[in-house]
Amino acid sequence: MLRNGNEGMSTIPGFSQIQFEGFCRFINQGLAEELEKFPTIKDPDHEIAFQLFAKGYQLLEPSIKERNAVYESLTYSSELYVSARLIFGFDVQKETISIGNIPIMNSLGTFIINGIYRIVINQILLSPGIYYRSELDHKGISIYTGTIISDWGGRSELAIDKKERIWARVSRKQKISILVLSSAMGSNLREILDNVSYPEIFLSFPNAKEKKRIESKEKAILEFYQQFACVGGDLVFSESLCEELQKKFFQQKCELGRVGRRNMNRRLNLDIPQNNTFLLPRDVLAATDHLIGMKFGTGILDDDDMNHLKNKRIRSVADLLQDQFGLALGRLQHAVQKTIRRVFIRQSKPTPQTLVTPTSTSILLITTYETFFGTYPLAQVFDQTNPLTQTVHGRKVSCLGPGGLTGRTASFRSRDIHPSHYGRICPIDTSEGINVGLTGSLAIHARIDHWWGSIESPFYEISEKAKEKKERQVVYLSPNRDEYYMIAAGNSLSLNQGIQEEQVVPARYRQEFLTIAWEQIHVRSIFPFQYFSIGGSLIPFIEHNDANRALMSSNMQRQAVPLSRSEKCIVGTGLERQTALDSRVSVIAQREGKIISSDSHKILLSSSGKTISIPLVAHRRSNKNTCMHQKPRVPRGKSIKKGQILAEGAATVGGELALGKNVLVAYMPWEGYNFEDAVLISERLVYEDIYTSFHIRKYEIQTDTTSQGSAEKITKQIPHLEEHLLRNLDRNGVVRLGSWVETGDILVGKLTPQIASESSYIAEAGLLRAIFGLEVSTSKETSLKLPIGGRGRVIDVKWIQRDPFDIMVRVYILQKREIKVGDKVAGRHGNKGIISKILPRQDMPYLQDGAPVDMVFNPLGVPSRMNVGQIFESSLGLAGDLLKKHYRIAPFDERYEQEASRKLVFSELYEASKQTKNPWVFEPEYPGKSRIFDGRTGDPFEQPVLIGKSYILKLIHQVDEKIHGRSTGPYSLVTQQPVRGRAKQGGQRIGEMEVWALEGFGVAHILQEILTYKSDHLIARQEILNATIWGKRMPNHEDPPESFRVLVRELRSLALELNHFLVSEKNFQVNREDV
């Protein structure tokens, strides 16, 4: 139990702090721990000894800037220098040498690997140690097992069979007697019997033959090896046999690590020192003792809850990077050994630096890390859709990945919410689909103890001293500590001092929820939001929503696109400011001073006699193709303080998160256009750029050298292409900045040389060569063309040339996208929908003051979904809009009084009605609703309608990126079927369901044509167009279509031969033909 330094004070920790703390632990401790494990490398004759030292290592400043690393597709890394010693004969050399580069974390808590922002997700795994469980077999007999989990994730099981014999199951197939295992680990029979509580059970099952096998350690090891490796015959004890056992079994299944040793000691009441990180015979015997106690009723029947957080540990960025560093050092060791052998062959004098500087050795470190970031499932591309995603991504915890669960095999129980999650892992925020419950998000106050890997949550201590002094101390409890405390829920208020004794409060104790007297409480929650993640904490009136809809909302807020003109919400929760601040999309003043000048690229600040240039991000592409842009917010000559906002990023206003827009909504059906969650919108949202967003797409092309050795060329001189397609190219063949480009336009002109044979030259080419001696170009045009849906303005062109023949050109195109039919919009309560129709503003329903509504939602989407929070939000938003107020409401306001949310909303509506002198704003007969009029006829609607100002987001699922059609396109070379997918211009025209529809109408000839001649009959599909145009008869080919050939080949692969016969109509003669 840890106390916080500031007694009685509790602030929300920095949301990116977890990533920074993890990386700092890796740099300060992880590197040293791995360097200490690096062995002294000696040659066989012991003439050379090479050693690295853990003390005094240094990391240099990165040689390139972060922005250049992104543009030039490089890795943002720092060079690591380590002290090394080389003994060569009698000569001893000490030197600080460079062993390679290590990726460095930037200010966002991410890494830049090959120009791409990547982040490492925290993994949550079963902690190493021992876990007991009992289960009934098919006959109803209780089976008791103890599972030992190593630090590597290897598992071994201890079990008692029907004959009361004790076995250790070291793999799925092999089980070994517990006596053989203990003896192989170094104990003799006398030591075993002296160290167990039930020696009679151990003595009951070995017969004379088995006792002989464990007479000595060598015999026990041979017996263990025979059973483990399933090897027969007479084996001879040897060092290589021991090394193989050490590598295959003991290292993988018996290394507990620091955390495993602590858990083993705690579970079995042992006092083995913490530095003993391997499984000892004493551990195995104590574990067996406990199992016997469970079986024969002398012990406590306590199954371990594998889903309790006390039995889990977090593998943070520190652990994963440290593992990779250890792996790289192992490779470095092998490389140095090879170099030493070469030294003897060449008979040259080595130095510490020359042993590690050959090209392959010096890049070992960085290539290991690049492979890790590129292939490891928890090293993900950083989600930069909006500031919220940037903050939330680093706080995710995942049960997936190496050593963890998989989406297909995880049980319901492992996905479920556990009482130990409260205040640590958000019960709401998880992914939808196959990984539901397997990826979660840390609660906003949770922190990770990086030493033990546990998640801690803060509480106020309610001790007698604290009560007397009237002060509160903040304590952080780990999951295995809070079981011993009575914890009052955070949504209960402090009690009235006078009647404390009589009052009872809801509390949590040992995973149960109770109602107990106030004086029995030990600690209480510090904040109503304490249980939720950032996504859940941004939902106003979350307590009025169904949990499934809150889950959808926290996921959809991460998909919101930054709009061209951001607007902060009228109704919020108060967490918007810190979320925006910790995303680091805004520029914050690091010192006080005076603004000299500001423009869209930089701000010049004068501070303490120095002029500081602060660069701004101008229209930079994010990983999700959204536009990142910073707008200066301080005029020239203004004095600023430290911590003040100098420039705002995308989707922030006034330092607060601003993902959507406050729009006037009505909940009513409208001619069926909002059936099944569809949304009707006004054209005002299009013409006034309310929901207009900017997107930046990147297109790149690279030159290469062909197999004949000739280089590709970037040029404007491309034969056989229309001038219209080349209109935007400059003299180098690259598109000009500021050009407007359409689908199919050439962005970069490129020619690939081809070798043509003499016979393939046309006659004119021979003539030109004979008369003028000119060679005709046989280059192939391989230019970069703008694909479908890519039209826009060229805002940047990057020309990266690593050598004369290796050139990469990147073109960035900015697109302006207004909201349109097919785009997805959503509120903050899981109320999502697709735009079905854009109405002229004069046709939209209008209020009694003549204001037309902006959006019409379906009211049937509320009762069944039980997300009533949207109703409170829209009504309070209307009041706030009329009163020019903004509200920041904490959840669970019913702790103040019953119906507190409704009372607040109605009182504000009444106040707005009074101040604006609009009685329709609050009508007592139907509060929150109002009579509104049909814009087409001017008649009032039959029923009063709920109207309000809701905060609605535009999501990244946009119709421009999804709509697709195909008339003709590419076919698969193998099956001759149309290819799949929008990216390949594919699309199967007639599928299974279309065939059913045609069968239903009995159109046999159309069906035959569509499935054969017009689809995949190679010759017929060429001829059929001609026949259709000239009105000829359809060709009737006797050979089968390609789909039939594919079927035949698939049957052949199953060893089934399908023969194809043609039967003559005249004489029924059978002619066999090969398919």
From Swiss-Prot:
What name goes with this protein? Answer: DNA-directed RNA polymerase subunit beta
Any one cellular component term from GO for this entry? Answer: DNA-directed RNA polymerase complex
Top-down, what is the taxonomic lineage of the species of origin? Eukaryota, Viridiplantae, Streptophyta, Embryophyta, Tracheophyta
Name the SUPFAM superfamilies for this protein.
Answer: beta and beta-prime subunits of DNA dependent RNA-polymerase
Q: Where in the cell is it found?
A: Plastid, Chloroplast
The species this protein was found in: Zea mays
Enzyme class of the recorded protein, top EC level: transferase
Kindly give the PROSITE patterns that the UniProt entry links to this protein: RNA_POL_BETA (PS01166)
- What does the record give as the reaction this protein catalyses? RNA(n) + a ribonucleoside 5'-triphosphate = RNA(n+1) + diphosphate
Q: Which UniProt keywords apply?
A: Chloroplast, DNA-directed RNA polymerase, Nucleotidyltransferase, Plastid, Transcription, Transferase
Q: What does this protein do?
A: DNA-dependent RNA polymerase catalyzes the transcription of DNA into RNA using the four ribonucleoside triphosphates as substrates.
Assembly and interaction partners: In plastids the minimal PEP RNA polymerase catalytic core is composed of four subunits: alpha, beta, beta', and beta''. When a (nuclear-encoded) sigma factor is associated with the core the holoenzyme is formed, which can initiate transcription.
